[in-house]
Amino acid sequence: MKKKHRIKKNDEFQTVFQKGKSTANRQFVVYQLDKEEQPNFRIGLSVSKKIGNAVVRNRIKRMIRQSITELKDEIDSGKDFVIIARKPCAEMTYEEVKKSLIHVFKRSGMKRIKK
């Protein structure tokens, strides 16, 4: 994911948590906040230490980032997203992670996701 698509600062995460709406499935929670003045989407990732050690957490983040990279043309611009991984995603394959992200994005009301 390019820098323009990342949320890094704590106050930006907090804004999305407090003002955004959340959607969830068994593997992920997605907070979504509309930002009309923003030309593209931004995504922040959160993987708790409860999920596993650093190797497991980094693997999950890499799979999420790769899924987002493949879906970037279908994700609505002008929005901030925070994706929180839940414990079941520690044992998932890349295809399952991508499918689960598509599912939770569709539940959040994104019309452009087709896959």
Curated annotation (Swiss-Prot):
<comment type="similarity">
    <text>Belongs to the RnpA family.</text>
</comment>
<dbReference type="InterPro" id="IPR020568">
    <property type="entry name" value="Ribosomal_Su5_D2-typ_SF"/>
</dbReference>
<dbReference type="InterPro" id="IPR020539">
    <property type="entry name" value="RNase_P_CS"/>
</dbReference>
<dbReference type="GO" id="GO:0000049">
    <property type="term" value="F:tRNA binding"/>
</dbReference>
<comment type="function">
    <text>RNaseP catalyzes the removal of the 5'-leader sequence from pre-tRNA to produce the mature 5'-terminus. It can also cleave other RNA substrates such as 4.5S RNA. The protein component plays an auxiliary but essential role in vivo by binding to the 5'-leader sequence and broadening the substrate specificity of the ribozyme.</text>
</comment>
<dbReference type="GO" id="GO:0004526">
    <property type="term" value="F:ribonuclease P activity"/>
</dbReference>
<dbReference type="InterPro" id="IPR000100">
    <property type="entry name" value="RNase_P"/>
</dbReference>
<dbReference type="Pfam" id="PF00825">
    <property type="entry name" value="Ribonuclease_P"/>
</dbReference>
<keyword id="KW-0694">RNA-binding</keyword>
<dbReference type="InterPro" id="IPR014721">
    <property type="entry name" value="Ribsml_uS5_D2-typ_fold_subgr"/>
</dbReference>
<protein>
    <recommendedName>
        <fullName>Ribonuclease P protein component</fullName>
        <ecNumber>3.1.26.5</ecNumber>
    </recommendedName>
</protein>
<keyword id="KW-0540">Nuclease</keyword>
<dbReference type="GO" id="GO:0030677">
    <property type="term" value="C:ribonuclease P complex"/>
</dbReference>
<dbReference type="GO" id="GO:0042781">
    <property type="term" value="F:3'-tRNA processing endoribonuclease activity"/>
</dbReference>
<keyword id="KW-0255">Endonuclease</keyword>
<keyword id="KW-0378">Hydrolase</keyword>
<dbReference type="GO" id="GO:0001682">
    <property type="term" value="P:tRNA 5'-leader removal"/>
</dbReference>
<comment type="subunit">
    <text>Consists of a catalytic RNA component (M1 or rnpB) and a protein subunit.</text>
</comment>
<keyword id="KW-0819">tRNA processing</keyword>
